From Swiss-Prot:
It catalyses: RNA(n) + a ribonucleoside 5'-triphosphate = RNA(n+1) + diphosphate. It is an enzyme of class 2 (transferase). GO terms for cellular component: DNA-directed RNA polymerase complex. Keywords: DNA-directed RNA polymerase, Nucleotidyltransferase, Transcription, Transferase. The RNAP catalytic core consists of 2 alpha, 1 beta, 1 beta' and 1 omega subunit. When a sigma factor is associated with the core the holoenzyme is formed, which can initiate transcription. DNA-dependent RNA polymerase catalyzes the transcription of DNA into RNA using the four ribonucleoside triphosphates as substrates. Residues 1383-1408 are annotated as: Disordered. Belongs to the RNA polymerase beta chain family. This is DNA-directed RNA polymerase subunit beta. GO terms for biological process: DNA-templated transcription. Pfam families: RNA_pol_Rpb2_1, RNA_pol_Rpb2_2, RNA_pol_Rpb2_3, RNA_pol_Rpb2_45, RNA_pol_Rpb2_6, RNA_pol_Rpb2_7.
Length: 1408
């Protein structure tokens, strides 16, 4: 029976108090789902939704020609199988992509000249190749030109309407100027803004501003595009004013006596112009008093219909309509005209007793729009549209048709303007509209409502939008980014198609003649190759991969730029809670612009980030979970995940700490309607891997989560003793481990692959799917040159379940993330070697390879076809001794396993040299002794400085039609053998399974007819009863002829037929792969052969390497001390690392101390358990002890099922310490750490007596000792240090280049020169500034002097001086250099003055 305690079994004691409600969603879903939605590859063409690729095709097609006589329509598309699989693309430097084929239909119309009716003349349908589209791998990455890349999701401003003000900065008075902006997904922006005179203006696409009423009036000239209740709006002044202002009726009794109608909703805040009494004589409001709510109620009760009004008040009012004299139609009072005494008299004269005025009280309602109308001199919609045309196209003479056309195209044409579903959703939400979500263009009501809201803001109603609210920012994931690129490509292609349709004779053309997919593929290539959002994957370790795929960037096309982004955008916002991690963001210029999704967050169909909450009903917490976006969450009161509840889920306290509308409040239990799912939903994956995160300062937690991503995978991995319980999830979702696809039993295991026989119901006659072969990744190079290697962690015969980890990858151990090592640390100063965060380390760590990592470098050698002839890869290299070639094979490529150092030849290569003119003597010698190897030069690939390692692999790629060399053939045959082994294994398992099934069917059955082999030997007699023994005598090839009677016979034939078909399919698939290996490779033009050599470098921990814990506690190794000199414990065990205690208090990352104590307790408990097992082995007693330690009822039940051997195995696993999990914000309390220290028989203080390794004396005070998880970071001293010998110089300044990559020198800057001057080191300084730097002449003289043995320095003129001269001359300054005479000559002139007496010495030269 397989044991329960397999190698991939790991149990953690968890300190969590809060039960798990839902699992963390798959960590790379954001990438995979978005791309699946974009491609819709597995959905039938007729069932695809109009989004992603389908949506793009649908929106660009049909393409009509300019005369509308033909159109090209889109029917469907499908993806074919990719040419190369993922591994082949990696090796060959190809892009992992699939060809896309599109079915298009070309329809040619006949147009009736008289009626204009169209009839179809011809329809041609054809499948057209549409280029390749990159596919996403299983792990959410793309392989572009052989390297893995990730497309980062972009956070951008959501489409919709936004309201804001200028914070009083625009005008000197400090007045708030409000503005509104309608931002579409694509199309023209509309900005509305008030100026300091309170007039309302509009800008279209940030052009010159127009009065807003011009745009409002222009709307009257176009039909409304609303799908639901369209608005009848003709754009007249009356319509405009009555849309925005309420009206009152004025009753004229005489020239001095007026009344107005009572409009109850308009009264609050107004003052009474005189005492107002009811009919009963009761005083309702005194003169000059405001109408209060009580007064309005009294008015209502008294049923008063009118109120008296003073002349002063009446003569500020504005007419709402034209008042017309009925008999002859003369306008007595125009709309928007102020009422005056003259007008009143005129009205009374014509017998008009009542008219309507606008309600403008300058308190709650301002006259802004009315005053803007006064400014606007245009009177009809047509004039307004012409004015807009003039602003947008200055210099173009407008005609009514072109003007209306342009205006319609701006906002009401779906091809030019797209609000997107999100934009429509936001507008509906903001203004309470009911327009359907597919109404993705603006309607009249949208524009009018935006202006209404803006005027309300100005009047003091409503609030401005918070641009950083996550309801106003949305995520564009891969699918959407690619969709936009594809649209750009198709639009470019559309132009070309239109031109072709009109140029050529359409009847003779087929669709493929019109379509050229080059522009589309070019756009896609450019996006993946050079877009800011398509990034080289950070593959340092599994965590960095996962984080990279979950990253959100506010940068990139259509986003912000580093320089322009202010503090608000970068800051943490209340809506980030549970959606975006407040901790994980880079330090430096990108801080806050690049963020990470929180653990439970997901992106909804509109691109808004959602987070899950548990529903609370009547004060009882349920287990129903729903996802809410930032906007949906606004109205709810949300309790924290750690709010206390009783067994029934009721809140234990009357007041619960909650969040409402972004504020923290103490809410009543019955008011709470949602509750957090988990305490870790607040933070990202990297931050949730930090134990005791709650005890760390936020700045250090930020460094901690960033530095975990830089941890180098080590040769020996160890999962942290103190984890947070999320390690296994990260390892599983990152894709670096190998995960079982279905339940089954392990058939065979070796270092390179695992074969699992899956559980398939015995009833099936189909044998196709019974075997799963997992090929493991062996010693591959990652993007960051770390080593990717998988090793199996299960044994033959083990039972595996779907989702189990069956092989560990880099930086994982037993299926858990293992970025570093558990080491014993002591916090104490030691001889100043841990000053300023330095780290003192024991030599044991080097001896045991604790922090050793493997790095793989790839070197490439290319043989090209040059003008002078072909380059050749060969062992025969001119002027190279046999010693240097000892490791090359006959093809000139280094053998695998060779140890190489800088300067060694990896691949021998010779390049033809240009023909040189030979002297007669050389010609003679050549004629006598034959051709000498003088016409080629050595251009071999050599190991660069700083690389010492072992060759682990070599690959040879040859052009088609080029003879393969021995090495290439050898590699080919090895790969072929590997594939054949896979094929044979698969066939063997299939056969075993099929015959096993048949055996089960025919066992105990009676043979119906005798079975004879080819030679006539009887194998089975009629009437034999079949059993395993008898069946084993019959060779497999005769099993198909066994007859046991129907219906079993036909079932038997079915199984065998199915087996044969499956075998054929398997052979075919492997045959294709083998053929691909044998075929020549696709190489860039001009390349004949390419060799890649991989060198593995072992890097032990060295002085200068950077190390860190998980709490932002980083340092550099300062000294590696012999084990015997390290401080040691009472039992003689030395500690591994000594850290500086002064690094803790000021940094406030106390989590590291708690981790150290808990780690010590976990180690001590494991050791105590070991001692207990050795002292008194009794499985029952140990079970009880384990139940006490783990204190988990479910684990207790599991223990009861184990036998003695399994219990022993379980105890053996904990000899280095038991593994514990302390989840973030829900971790171990101090009392629990004390309890575990007691279990491990350790002092509760966590401090021990330490002895000095050099003297054996105890230190004065007890020292904090414990186990900390330390990481070795990617900043390795071996990769940073370098020394320049002969290297390149800059062209302009002639100074050596800088940096290791350029093999540069050390710069001696201004300050260093001052230091040399201060020491008075004149000669050294002269050397530094001339011959060692940029003095070209001096450099050559120096070389000559050294060769001749003169030790004299003759410096020339530094090139930088020449540069200075040229710069001065470029400023038109004539600079002349004077050469001073040598000292002796000066004396001979009697030393009168420098430069000689007769002016002969004054000559201009370039040498000073």
């Amino acid at each position: 029976m397989p044991t329960q305690i397999q190698n991939n079994f790991r149990v953690r004691k968890t300190f969590a108090k809060i039960a798990k409600i839902i699992d963390i969603p798959n960590l790379i879903n954001i990438q995979k789902q978005s791309y699946e939605k974009f491609l819709q590859a597995d959905i039938a063409a007729d069932k695809r939704e109009d989004l992603g690729l389908q949506g793009v095709f649908k929106s660009v097609f049909p393409i009509r020609d300019f005369n509308e006589t033909s159109s090209l329509e889109f029917v469907s598309y499908h993806l074919e199988r990719p040419k190369y699989d993922v591994d082949e693309c990696h090796q060959r430097g190809m892009t992992y992509s699939a060809p896309i084929k599109v079915v298009v239909r070309l329809v040619v119309w006949d147009k009736d000249e008289e009626t204009g009716a169209q009839s179809i003349r011809d329809v041609k349908e054809q499948e057209v190749y549409f280029g390749e589209i990159p596919l996403m791998t299983q792990n959410g990455t793309f392989i572009i030109n052989g390297t893995e890349r990730v497309v980062v999701s972009q956070l951008h401003r959501s489409p919709g309407a936004f309201f804001d003000h200028d914070k009083g900065k625009s005008h000197s008075s400090g007045k708030l100027l409000y503005n509104a902006r309608i931002i579409p997904y694509r199309g023209s922006w509309i900005d509305f803004e008030f100026d300091h005179k309170d007039l309302l203006y509009v800008r279209i696409d940030r052009r010159r501003k127009l009065p807003a009423t011009v745009l409002i009036r222009a709307l009257g000239a176009v039909p409304d595009t609303a799908k639901k209740n369209p608005l009848e709006f003709k754009g007249s002044t009356e319509e405009i004013l009555n849309y925005y202002y309420a009206t009152e009726t004025i009753y004229l009794h005489s020239a001095e006596e007026f009344e107005k109608s009572v409009e109850l909703e308009l009264l609050p805040g107004q003052r009474a112009t005189r005492d107002i009494k009811a009919k009963t004589g009761e005083l309702i409001v005194k003169k000059n008093r405001k109408f209060t709510r009580a007064a309005i109620k009294k008015l209502e009760a008294a049923k008063m219909k009118t109120l008296p009004i003073d002349a002063d008040e009446l003569f500020t009012k504005v007419s709402a309509y034209d008042v017309v004299e009925e008999t002859n139609g003369v306008v007595l009072l125009e709309c928007n005209e102020e009422v005056t005494q003259e007008k009143v008299d005129e009205l009374l004269k014509h017998g008009i007793k009542e008219f309507k005025v606008l309600f403008i009280d300058n308190l709650n309602v301002g006259p802004y729009l009315r005053e803007t109308l006064m400014l606007d001199k245009l009177e009809t919609p047509e004039q307004s549209i012409m004015e807009i045309y003039r602003r947008l196209r200055p210099g173009d003479p407008p005609t009514p048709e072109t003007a209306i056309n342009l205006f319609t195209n701006l906002f009401f044409n779906p091809e030019r303007y797209d609000l997107s579903k999100v934009g429509r959703l936001k507008l509906n939400f903001k203004f309470g509209l009911e327009e359907p979500l597919d109404g993705q263009i603006l309607t009249k009501r949208d524009i009018l409502e935006v202006i209404r809201y803006l005027i309300d803001l100005k009047n003091g109603k409503g609030t401005i939008d918070d641009i950083d609210h996550l309801g106003n920012r949305r995520v564009r994931a891969v699918g959407e980014l690619l969709e936009n690129q594809y649209r750009i490509g198709l639009v470019r292609m559309e132009r070309a198609i239109k031109e072709r349709m009109s140029l050529q004779e359409i009847e003779t053309l087929m669709p493929h003649d019109l379509i050229n997919a080059k522009p589309v593929t070019a756009v896609i290539k450019e996006f993946f190759g050079s877009s800011q959002l398509s990034q080289f994957m950070d593959q340092t370790n599994p965590l960095s991969e996962v984080t990279h795929k979950r990253r959100l960037s506010a940068l990139g096309p259509g986003g912000l730029t580093r320089e322009r982004a202010g503090f608000e955008v970068r800051d943490v916002h209340p809506t980030h809670y549970g959606r975006i991690c407040p901790i994980e963001t880079p330090e430096g210029p990108n801080i806050g612009l690049i963020a990470s999704l929180s653990t439970y967050a997901r992106v909804n169909e509109f691109g808004f980030v959602e987070t899950p909450y548990r529903k609370v009903e009547a004060g009882v917490v349920t287990n129903d979970v729903a996802f809410y976006s930032a906007l949906e969450e606004e109205k709810h009161t949300i309790a924290q995940a750690n709010a206390e509840t009783d067994k029934k889920g009721k809140f234990a306290n009357a007041l619960v700490s909650s969040r409402r509308g972004g504020e923290f409040v103490q809410a009543r239990a019955e008011d709470v309607d949602l509750m957090d799912v988990s305490p870790k939903q607040l933070v990202s994956v990297a931050a949730s891997l930090i134990p005791f995160l709650e005890n760390d300062d936020a700045n250090r937690a930020l460094m901690g989560s960033n530095m975990q991503r830089q941890a180098v995978p080590l040769l020996r991995t160890a999962a942290p003793l103190v984890g947070t319980g999320i390690e296994s999830i990260v390892a599983r979702d990152s894709g670096v481990t190998c995960v079982a696809r279905r339940d089954g039993i392990v058939e065979s295991v070796d270092a390179g692959r695992i074969v699992v026989k899956a559980d398939v119901p015995a009833s099936l006659s189909d044998v196709t799917s019974e075997v799963d072969i997992y090929n493991l990744l062996k010693y591959q190079r990652s993007n960051q040159n770390t080593c990717l290697n998988q090793k199996p962690i299960i044994s033959k015969g083990d039972r595996v379940m779907k989702g189990d980890v069956i092989a560990d990858g880099p930086a994982t151990e037993t299926g858990e993330l293992a970025l570093g090592q558990n080491v014993v640390v002591a916090f104490m100063p030691w001889q100043g070697y841990n000053f300023e965060d330095s780290i003192l380390i024991s030599e044991r760590i080097l001896k045991d390879d604790v922090f050793t990592s493997i790095h793989i470098e790839e070197f490439e050698c290319i043989a090209r076809d040059t003008k002078l002839g072909k380059e050749e890869i060969t062992r025969d290299i001119p002027n190279v001794g046999e010693e240097a070639l000892k490791d090359l094979d006959e093809s000139g490529i280094i053998r695998i396993g060779a140890e190489v150092k800088p300067g060694d030849v990896l691949v021998g290569k010779i390049t033809p040299k240009g023909e040189t003119q030979l002297s007669p003597e050389e010609k003679l010698l050549r004629a006598i002794f034959g051709e000498k190897a003088g016409d080629v030069r050595d251009s071999s690939l050599r190991v660069p400085p700083g690389v010492v390692g072992t060759v682990i692999n070599a690959k040879v790629f040859s052009r088609k039609g080029v003879e393969k060399d021995e090495r290439a053939k050898q590699i080919e045959s090895m790969e072929e053998a590997k594939l054949l082994k896979d094929q044979n294994d698969e066939i063997k398992v299939l056969q075993d399974s099929a015959f096993g099934r048949i055996r089960g069917l025919v066992r105990t059955k009676e043979v119906q007819g005798k079975l004879v082999d080819d030679k006539g030997k009887i194998l089975l007699k009629k009437g034999d009863i079949l059993d395993d023994e008898l069946l084993s005598t019959v060779p497999y090839k005769y099993w198909g002829e066994i007859s046991v009677g129907d219906p079993l016979d036909s079932r038997l034939r079915d199984i065998l037929r199915n087996l044969e078909e499956t075998k054929e399919a398997v052979k075919l698939a492997f045959g294709e792969k083998i053929a691909r290996i044998k075929k020549g490779d696709e190489l860039p033009p001009g390349v004949i052969k390419m060799v890649k050599v991989y060198v593995a470098i072992k890097r032990k921990l060295a002085v200068g390497d950077k190390m860190a814990g998980r709490h932002g506690n980083k340092g550099v190794v300062s000294r590696i001390l012999p084990e015997e000199d390290m401080p040691y414990l009472e039992d003689g065990r030395p500690v591994d690392i000594v850290l500086n205690p002064l690094g803790v208090p000021s940094r406030m990352n106390i989590g590291q101390i708690l981790e150290t104590h808990l780690g010590w307790a976990a180690k001590g408990t494991g050791e105590a358990l070991q001692r207990y097992v050795e002292a008194n082995w009794s499985s029952d007693a140990i079970k009880e002890r384990l139940k006490v330690i783990y204190s988990d009822p479910a684990f207790g039940e599991f223990l009861d099922k184990l036998d003695d051997e399994e219990i022993k195995q379980l105890c053996l696993r904990s000899k280095r310490g038991i593994h514990v999990a302390t989840p973030v914000f829900d971790g171990a309390q101090e009392t629990e750490i004390h309890a575990l220290l007691d279990e491990g028989q350790l002092p509760r203080s966590g401090q021990m007596v330490l002895f000095d390794g050099r003297t054996g004396e105890p230190f004065d005070q007890n020292v904090t000792v414990g186990v900390m998880y330390m990481l070795k970071l990617h900043h390795l001293v071996d990769e940073k240090i370098h020394a320049r010998s002969i290297g390149p110089y800059s062209l302009v300044t002639q100074q050596p280049l800088g940096g290791k990559a350029q093999f540069g020198g050390q710069r001696l800057g201004e300050m260093e020169v001052w230091a040399m001057e201060a020491y008075g080191a004149a000669y050294t300084l002269q050397e530094f500034l001339t011959v060692k730097s940029d003095d070209v002449v001096g450099r050559t003289r120096m070389y000559e002097a050294i060769v001749k043995g003169d030790n004299v320095l003759e410096s020339g003129l530094p090139e930088s001086f020449n540069v200075l001269l040229k710069e001065l001359q470029s400023l038109a300054l004539d600079v002349e250099l004077l050469e001073s005479a040598p000292p002796e000559r000066q004396r001979s002139f009697g030393g009168d003055f420098l430069g000689g007496g007769d002016g002969e010495e004054r000559k201009t030269g370039t040498e000073a």
